[in-house]
Amino acid sequence: TSEVDVLVVGGGAGGGVGSAGNNTHGGGGGAGGLILAPGLAMDADEAVTVTIGGGGASTTAGGDTTFGAAPSPWYLIAKGGGDGGDQPRGDGQAGGSGGGGAGSQSANAEASGGATTQGQQSGNSGNLGVGYAGGAFGGGGNTVAHSAGGGGGAGAVGGQASPGGGNYGAGNGG
């Protein structure tokens, strides 16, 4: 028996679609959830099934990545990222890391960033997993806001967006 360190990462999501006619931007796609499982005891000749989650196309969530199979104690699921908000939907979607909220088409509207679901997984997938929420678009009174929230990452929450400013006020990725 040997000890191995295992890194499992879900597929990243696609960003949301903006509206050229309304000069709004889609939210950033969330990163896939990340799991670092150090010191797993495994036999050298032990076969392990691994499924790699693909990245999402525009407005599509990333796929889940799995390591092992249930009911093994080292069965791990890294959730795919949540897709970025688009128009007219607005809100970013939940995932391993959440997608960012889209820029608004109307005055004072808000769009939430998607929540992270990685920590809600059972067993080591949640206990050892990391993911953060997407950033939101917080309104601000401009009919054409341009900006959008950044997708969440493995290191931080996605940046909040606000109208105006550099880069049209878009939030940074987490």
Placement of each model-derived feature along the sequence:
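Extracellular/periplasmic catalytic domains that process cell-envelope and extracellular macromolecules
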Residues: 1, 71, 123
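GGW-centered surface loops in extracellular recognition modules
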Residues: 1-10
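Glycine-rich strand-loop-strand elements at beta-sheet edges
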Residues: 9-70, 84-90, 99, 164-165, ...
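Structured loops at beta-to-helix junctions and adjacent beta-edge loops in soluble globular domains
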Residues: 38, 81, 133-135
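Ser/Thr- (and often Asn-) enriched beta-sheet segments in non-cytosolic proteins
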Residues: 47-51, 77, 145
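Short, well-ordered surface patches within globular domains
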Residues: 74, 78-84
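Glycine-rich (often Gly-Gly/Gly-Pro-rich) flexible segments and glycine-rich loop motifs
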Residues: 91-173
